[in-house]
């Protein structure tokens, strides 16, 4: 399981994130292929190794001649819908631009569909978004933690005139997200950067406990005095926190019930050892479910991320558990020529339980054209042979 931490203490922009991804080992070809799929005109990603504030960094130039710099949210949506992109890349890119459109509509008092993107509607910004989300999908990061975001100070020239930093759209995008001015007297977080960070983030804060494999350092376009204009991307695996199993839970009352099987499957895929639903009655008499997941502490970040991505919850509870598990062993029994696995459980060396694996029983029953109950009874009887005398099955 891959986890990532974004150090945005010097701000964030699309090209800084692209550079950090390349520096962290994502092939430029992966980013270029995603950009080519969506761009209606040629766009080239050119990588350059530079220094910012004395630090070595990767600068990713997005080179384009764009004949239509102003596009609506509908225009961008059409481009992405028609692009030959993987569904997860397309979905993330759409979420980034939807977030941008919603923020712009909020600050200008209009609707998202009426928003005319200016800087972020240009092909270079579309390339930034598509390339960055393709890069993170390539990394396979199931958890992305973002540091408090430095936004800068002063003023910035935009299509709407001279605006204070952070400009209104950035301030709206970062609503509820840890941010601060920082040392720079310039804009350090762009709308594209803010939208990308807030879409990709599964958590905010300092670097989580992790074993770091690669570090990418993405360079901004300017090299101001006083601070390195870079964004750092740490990629690795979660450190084993040594805290044993955790129970993660949340209450959900507004999710289509048809989605729950996919949610449970996603949590198990993310690393949960078990996941289940409990019907509950919430305040105001509203029927709901408690979603519970049991997970080792070292894999909890990915399961947290899956819960937030797969459900409508905006918070979850977490508590450490003490788990007592018997030693287990798998053996095989034969029922009319069909091999059925039986799980043995030992306590102090004695086999105290033996249970057939139901999937094997169901398969054998289908192959033998016999009732499942009959095959199960035979498998249980054969499993008894493994019990230590005097113990139960």
From Swiss-Prot:
| Catalyses which reaction(s) | Ni(II)-pyridinium-3,5-bisthiocarboxylate mononucleotide = pyridinium-3,5-bisthiocarboxylate mononucleotide + Ni(2+)
User: Which Gene Ontology molecular-function terms are recorded?
Assistant: lyase activity; nickel cation binding
Task: Write down the top EC class of this protein.
Answer: lyase
Does the keyword field hold Lyase? yes
User: EC number(s)?
Assistant: 4.99.1.12
Q: Which Gene3D superfamilies match?
A: mk0293 like domain, Transcriptional regulatory protein pf0864 domain like
List keywords of the entry alphabetically. Answer: Lyase, Nickel
Alphabetical list of InterPro entries matching this protein: Ni_insertion (IPR002822)
Q: Name one Pfam family in it.
A: Ni_insertion
Please, one GO biological process term?
A: protein maturation
- Is Methyltransferase there in the keyword field? no
Q: What does the UniProt record say this protein does?
A: Involved in the biosynthesis of a nickel-pincer cofactor ((SCS)Ni(II) pincer complex). Binds Ni(2+), and functions in nickel delivery to pyridinium-3,5-bisthiocarboxylic acid mononucleotide (P2TMN), to form the mature cofactor. Is thus probably required for the activation of nickel-pincer cofactor-dependent enzymes.
Q: Member of which family?
A: Belongs to the LarC family.
**Any idea what this protein is called?**
Pyridinium-3,5-bisthiocarboxylic acid mononucleotide nickel insertion protein
Organism, by scientific name, is Nocardioides sp. (strain ATCC BAA-499 / JS614)
What gene does this protein come from?
A: larC
């Amino acid at each position: 399981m891959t986890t990532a931490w974004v150090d945005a203490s010097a701000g964030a922009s699309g090209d800084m994130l692209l550079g950090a991804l390349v520096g962290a080992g994502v092939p430029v070809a992966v980013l270029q292929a995603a950009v080519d799929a969506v761009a209606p005109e040629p766009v080239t990603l050119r990588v350059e190794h530079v220094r910012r504030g004395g630090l070595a960094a990767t600068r990713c130039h997005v080179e384009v001649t764009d004949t239509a710099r102003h596009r609506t949210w509908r225009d961008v949506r059409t481009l992405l819908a028609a692009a030959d992109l993987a569904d997860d890349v397309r979905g993330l890119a759409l979420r980034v631009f939807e977030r941008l459109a919603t923020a712009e509509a909020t600050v200008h008092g209009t609707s998202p569909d009426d928003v005319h993107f200016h800087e972020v509607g240009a092909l270079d910004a579309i390339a930034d978004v598509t390339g960055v989300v393709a890069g993170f999908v390539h990394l396979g990061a199931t958890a992305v933690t973002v540091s408090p975001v430095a936004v800068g100070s002063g003023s910035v020239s935009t299509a709407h005139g001279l605006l204070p930093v952070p400009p209104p759209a950035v301030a709206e995008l970062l609503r509820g997200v840890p941010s601060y001015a920082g040392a720079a007297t310039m804009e350090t977080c762009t709308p594209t950067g803010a939208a990308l960070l807030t879409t990709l983030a599964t958590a905010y804060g300092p670097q989580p406990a992790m074993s770091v494999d690669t570090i990418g350092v993405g360079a901004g376009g300017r090299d101001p005095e006083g601070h390195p204009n870079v964004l750092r991307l740490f990629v690795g695996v979660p450190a084993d926190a040594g805290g044993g199993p955790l129970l993660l839970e949340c209450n959900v009352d507004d999710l289509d019930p048809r989605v729950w099987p996919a949610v449970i499957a996603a949590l198990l895929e993310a690393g949960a050892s078990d996941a289940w639903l409990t019907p509950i009655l919430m305040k105001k008499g509203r029927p709901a479910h408690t979603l519970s997941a049991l997970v080792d502490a070292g894999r909890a970040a990915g399961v947290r991320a899956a819960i937030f991505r797969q459900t409508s919850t905006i918070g979850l509870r977490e508590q450490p558990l003490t788990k007592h598990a018997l030693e287990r062993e798998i053996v095989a029994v034969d029922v009319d020529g069909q091999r059925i696995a039986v799980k043995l459980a030992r306590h102090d060396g004695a086999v105290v339980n033996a249970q057939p694996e139901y999937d094997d029983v169901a398969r054998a029953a289908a192959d033998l054209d016999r009732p499942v109950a009959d095959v199960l009874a035979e498998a249980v009887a054969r499993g008894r042979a493994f019990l230590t005398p005097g113990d139960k099955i």
